[in-house]
A protein has these predicted regions:
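Glycine-aromatic micro-motifs
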Residues: 1-112
């Protein structure tokens, strides 16, 4: 099965939530990894407070995991994040080339 490496840093790191939303738990690297040069802001999505990565602003280090998402699940994940997010290519601090979902900055309202 072909997969794409996706850096997950929010509630999608939870294997139980992955199974609920996508019908399976994704394989992931067992160690924590990090991405830098992104800002992490709190916003409300469907009434829930979530932290999301955005370009620009304050640069921070985001902690998460590299997950191996089956290619046939990427469209479902894209729909989960919605049109206000884009999937970009990044390299983590542990040298893993992967995708990262970031919030489109033209569509953001910070709450914190």
């Amino acid at each position: 099965m072909k997969t794409e490496k996706v850096f997950l840093y929010d509630n999608l790191c939870d294997p139980d939530l992955q199974e609920e939303l996508f019908g399976e738990k994704f394989d992931s690297d067992q160690y924590m990894d990090y991405v830098t040069d992104w800002d992490l802001v709190a916003i409300k999505i469907n009434g829930d407070l979530r932290k999301v990565a955005i370009e620009g602003g304050e640069r921070t280090t985001i902690i998460g995991h590299v997950n191996y998402v089956p290619l046939e699940k990427l469209n479902i994940m894209d729909k989960h994040y919605g049109k206000e997010f884009i999937r970009i290519k990044v390299t983590t601090m542990l040298d893993s080339d992967c995708s990262l979902y970031i919030k489109r900055t033209d569509k953001i309202k910070k709450v914190i």
